[in-house]
Amino acid sequence: IKPEHYMPAFEEGIRQHDAEIAAIIANPEAPTFKNTIEPLEFSGMLLTQVNLIFSSLTEAETNDELQAIAKEISPKLTEHYDNISLNGELFARIKTVYENRDKENLDTEQMKVLENHYKDFVRAGALLSEEDKATLREINN
């Protein structure tokens, strides 16, 4: 893998992740673990892999070219993840599943995954007002 391969890989990972999140939001069925939490759990795999490889490399053996890529991709990743964690439509689906978790007949692992996603979104600002979300976005960038 050469340094010039990273930005296109990051951009494709972001594009795929955006499409996966959009599909979850666009699902016309009532939110369930199967149609909301499960696809959320497995979304963004390419982006995660690219980021893991890139981060490992920059921590182990960095150079000016890799540092320039890191500087360029960092705000894009922050914006991308803010767009997910502060997305009201996505959080509404997660919250519905969370509030109906006792009706879902989830096993222990599924319950833990659901709770983790719900808490992660809350901690990331999903319950903030739109004004406060905008402020948080500014702080994050």
Protein language model regions, located:
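Zn2+-dependent metallopeptidase catalytic domains
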Residues: I1-N141
